[in-house]
Amino acid sequence: MTQRTVWQDFQNGQQYMATWPMRKELAAIFPEQRYIKATKFATRVMPAVAVMSVLSQMAFNNYGALPQAMTVALFALTMPLQGLWWLGKRSRTTLPPSLAIWYREIYEKITSEGHAMQPLKKQPRYLELAEVLNRAFKQLDKTSLERWF
């Protein structure tokens, strides 16, 4: 795996995180909502944890424990990256057949109501599902969505 693909995974993860609809109806079906919340939390909190782990050892003149504190700091700093990497990989994963059917049904419902969409994908990925779900929640009324949720 090259650096370019890892970097692309991080970028895809950010895009997927921004695209995925954070709806309670989807929380029981997909793990994305938990990963997104954990990644956002880690992005806010883990840099402070990293700094505190190193500074606390320095403040108490415990330089012997500084290597362990640095290890904890590095681990804390990689936690948001782990979430972004997982989300990036997930966004490029092809949907299983049952979800692909669901994707097509929702896509057809949106287009049948007259809303413009990108062309239907033959091998949809989770990113396309996120886009379709996002559009469905924004443009369809609750009665149209009752069939799926």
From Swiss-Prot:
Transmembrane regions = 41-60, 65-87
Q: Localized where? A: Cell inner membrane
Similarity comment: family membership: Belongs to the UPF0208 family.
This protein's name = UPF0208 membrane protein PBPRA2797
Q: Which InterPro entries match?
A: UPF0208 (IPR007334)
* GO CC, alphabetical: plasma membrane
Keywords from the named record: Cell inner membrane, Cell membrane, Membrane, Transmembrane, Transmembrane helix
Q: Which domain of life is it from?
A: Bacteria
The record gives the membrane topology as: Multi-pass membrane protein
